[in-house]
From Swiss-Prot:
Origin species: Yersinia pseudotuberculosis serotype I (strain IP32953)
Repressor listed as a keyword: yes
GO process terms (BP): negative regulation of DNA-templated transcription; peptide transport; positive regulation of DNA-templated transcription
DNA-binding region boundaries: 26-49
Protein name: HTH-type transcriptional regulator SgrR
InterPro entries reported in the protein's UniProt record: SBP_5, SBP_5_dom, SgrR_HTH_N, Tscrpt_reg_SgrR, WH_DNA-bd_sf
MF annotations from Gene Ontology: DNA binding; peptide transmembrane transporter activity
Domain HTH marR-type, first and last residues per copy: 1-113
Length: 553
């Protein structure tokens, strides 16, 4: 039996008898430990040898023997808990301790900086698993950030100013409006050791052609080593930014044959995935990264939904609650929570119904009915961005005839959506309308793969907003089901850089196709000793740029 298993058995005994010496029998102990009398005798011998207890046996069946505790179960439990923390076995820690508040405090005390075996380790507490890290698929906000730490594109979009920077390619040029050329760096390696080849770039980009944003790509070639040519059906001013977006990250061409690639992907980025399961994501600095090596050697993201629900609202936590050296960075998101009206629905495609719903479901009405807890994190939205005021308040019209029931759909693992849907249910019930709730996984929501009248979601945009606002929405298949046919004309204007984003957004809002609800306050709780931490528009920070100052003497 392993030492950890023996410790667990001892703790069960200690808890059963409250650490008090007692007279008992082998049979009684067998019932406590759920094993045979013979096995109990073996366990007691090992515990006695370890110096945890003294077992004074009396001969004869049914005779009561003396059990004397020499070690505190709490002390042993604390020792075992520290071992599990050190080994990042958080799920086992929860089973060992049992008390969620106690586990939370233990975890918070270990967040942030750790120095182990000469390595700097950053620990972060998060509220849900990050199970899909495959570029070109439906990615939520935090998955998008992680993918940027693991992969590279031909170009890179600077998170702070939106400027385009070299990445896998060091230079690029538009030879003609329909022909772009990218010059790649040599000797770039994937995390599994193989050198990047031009065929990896070609396969990564051509796999995206079926997607709306990339459908104008005609062909991708490599005329000479370390040169990639991209040919287009129609000009695209934004192509270099598009090839730096998270969907266009470069994968090894054999990615489909790699086991569990969506969960444990292989890229060329500053961090490689070491472990990714339901309770932990561990990424490690890639020593052969072609850029500056990351200063933090390892990032551990501990996933505990039942212990970190508040992080759904408050953001990323890198430090304990009770330290006086916390530093808080906050920003209002570039984006919003919103409602979409499905054009496939007979009710939602009716302008009068959409207008009536938007007049009823105002941000102020939702806030006034919501739990006060949320008011700290929600700011009323009157446009897609905080500085836009496109949703004009109008007088409430009478309810349209025949409107008695609606279906609202949102994605799972987002408790704020539960709160919003409850408030919507109350508002509509007061008007005689029953709201049916439908919860999907994120991929089905992203695809619009369900029958629904209204869809609840959120979007986070990044710099440059002129690129990301349209790109983020247009690449989402759900939007194709909810916006008008004009969207296909808008893509050409956007690619020509003649589509004014404020006007486009105002049109969607005023036509009651896209209904903003809230802007969310993003918060990042850091450590005083951390440097290089600047929160991005996704509520995270670039891991490879962060570092720790030495502890004070």
């Amino acid at each position: 039996m392993s030492t950890s298993r023996l410790q667990q058995q001892f703790i069960r005994l200690w808890q059963r008898y409250n650490g008090q010496s007692t007279e008992t029998t082998l049979q009684a102990l067998a019932e406590v430990l759920n094993c045979s009398r013979r096995h109990v005798r073996s366990l007691l011998g090992k515990m006695q040898h370890a110096g945890w207890l003294d077992w004074q046996a009396e001969a004869g069946r049914g005779k009561r023997s003396q059990l004397i505790f020499l070690r505190s179960g709490l002390a042993l439990q604390q020792q075992r808990a520290e071992e599990l923390l050190e080994q990042d076995h958080i799920d086992q820690l929860v089973q060992l301790v049992g008390d969620k508040k106690a586990v939370r405090q233990m975890l918070l005390s270990q967040l942030g900086r750790s120095f182990r075996q000469g390595k700097h380790i950053l620990r972060v507490l998060y509220y849900r698993p990050l199970e899909n890290l495959l570029p070109g698929t439906a990615l939520r906000r935090s998955e998008t950030h992680m993918v940027r730490q693991i992969f590279n594109g031909l170009t890179r979009i600077n998170e702070e100013n939106g400027e385009l920077e070299p990445d896998l390619s060091h230079h690029w040029q538009a030879i003609t409006p329909l022909h772009w050329r990218f010059y790649l760096r040599p000797a770039i390696h994937f995390h599994h050791g193989r050198e990047l080849e031009m065929s990896d770039v070609i396969s990564s980009l051509t796999r995206l052609i079926p997607q709306p944003l990339f459908s104008h790509i005609a062909e991708v070639r490599s005329p000479t080593p370390y040169v990639i040519d991209v040919y287009l059906h129609s000009p695209d001013h934004w192509l270099p930014w598009l090839l730096g977006s998270v969907h266009a990250m470069i994968l090894p061409q054999e990615w489909e044959t790699q086991p569990d690639f969506h969960r444990q992907p292989i890229g060329t980025g500053p961090y490689s995935v070491i472990r990714n399961h339901h309770s932990q994501l561990k990424i490690q600095a890639f020593d052969n990264y072609f850029g500056f090596r990351a200063l933090i050697d390892e990032v551990n993201i501990w996933v505990l939904p039942e212990l970190s629900e508040e992080l759904v609202y408050s953001g990323v936590q890198l430090q304990a609650d009770d330290t006086g050296k916390n530093e808080l960075e906050s920003r209002l998101e570039e984006g919003c929570y919103f409602l979409l009206f499905d054009q496939r629905s007979p009710q939602a495609c009716t302008p009068e119904i959409r207008r009536w719903l938007c007049e009823l479901i105002t941000p102020i009405a939702l806030l006034s009915h919501a739990d006060p807890f949320y008011q700290r994190y929600w700011s009323p939205a009157y446009g897609m961005l905080p500085r836009w005021h496109h949703n004009r308040l109008t007088t409430q019209e009478p309810k349209p005839e025949g409107l008695n029931e609606l279906t609202l759909t949102f994605y799972s693992e987002h408790s704020e959506f539960d709160a919003i849907s409850q408030t919507l249910t109350q508002l509509l019930a007061a008007q005689g309308v029953t709201l049916k709730i439908q919860v999907l996984d994120y991929t089905r929501w992203y695809q619009g793969d369900a029958q629904s009248d209204i869809w609840l979601g959120s979007a986070n945009f990044y710099l440059p907003l002129e690129f990301s606002l349209f790109a983020t929405l247009y690449e989402m298949p759900l939007l194709q089901h909810c916006l008008s046919e004009e969207l296909h004309q808008d893509i050409e204007s956007w690619r020509n850089n003649t589509l004014l984003m404020a006007d486009w957004s105002q049109r969607l809002v005023s036509q009651h196709q896209f209904h903003p609800l809230f802007h969310h306050w993003l918060e990042l709780y850091g450590q005083h000793s951390m440097r290089g931490v600047r929160m991005n528009t996704l509520g995270w920070f670039d891991f490879k740029s962060a570092w720790f100052t030495p502890p004070e003497a």
